[in-house]
Amino acid sequence: AEGAAWEGTLADTWIELTDESTMMGCVVEALDGHTVVGAESNYISSIDNLKAFDGGTMSGWMGTLNDWFTNFGFGEFTVAKGTLCAGDEIRIMYTRTVEDLGGSWNNSDTRLKALTFSTGKLAPKFSGDTFTYTLTVPEGTTSLLVTPTAANKNYQVRAYLGTQATGREYSRTSLIPIENGSVITVVCADDSWPTMNKTSDGKRTYTINVV
């Protein structure tokens, strides 16, 4: 943005987890060679001199874990607690309004904004208000990536092969094995999942039948 100390992407890398890994530790490791201020106190206030409040009273650094704005500091998400796992995706971004990154405390919308697949044609066309779909994939397809995006990223989204109750959960970076007749279930804002928001519009479940 105009007047910013810098813009663009500083790092896009994989980090090898250990039993001692934390979300914050992964961020610091990924930004090795850059100047990160505040990580030791569990709040990043500056990266390479791009500081909190440089872009206004609401501006600063925020982070998502699997495209979800976490409800605690990054240091609270750890391998030891089972809240940081192989395949998880961490993004640290600079915001001016919070809502410019897709999160909001001002609404309780638990629909999906988008739902994409690495292959195949979805029918009908995706809408956050449509909850059942057919995904037609090319013959011989044995796996695919599912990338859901919440309308409000303060709510978690998870994907399952099968149902939420009996299926297996897959991370957003993991290929889901499929065959003709497979069912993929994408859930947003289960009541038992953490969120910074005090209320929600209730759990939303999207069912995708693979053919």
Predicted regions and their residues:
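Eukaryote-biased recognition of intrinsically disordered, low-complexity regulatory segments
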Residues: 1-14
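Short, solvent-exposed loop/turn positions at domain surfaces
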Residues: 11, 77-78, 172
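Short, surface-exposed loop motifs enriched in S/T, G, D/E and P with embedded aromatic residues
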Residues: 13-17, 122-125
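Hydrophobic, secondary-structure "cap" segments at the distal end of domains
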Residues: 19-82
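Residue-level "contact hotspot" at macromolecular interaction interfaces
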Residues: 83-84, 177
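Loop/turn positions that initiate beta-strands
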Residues: 87-90
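Short, surface-exposed secondary-structure boundary micro-motifs
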Residues: 94-95
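Beta-rich interaction/scaffold domains
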Residues: 98-211
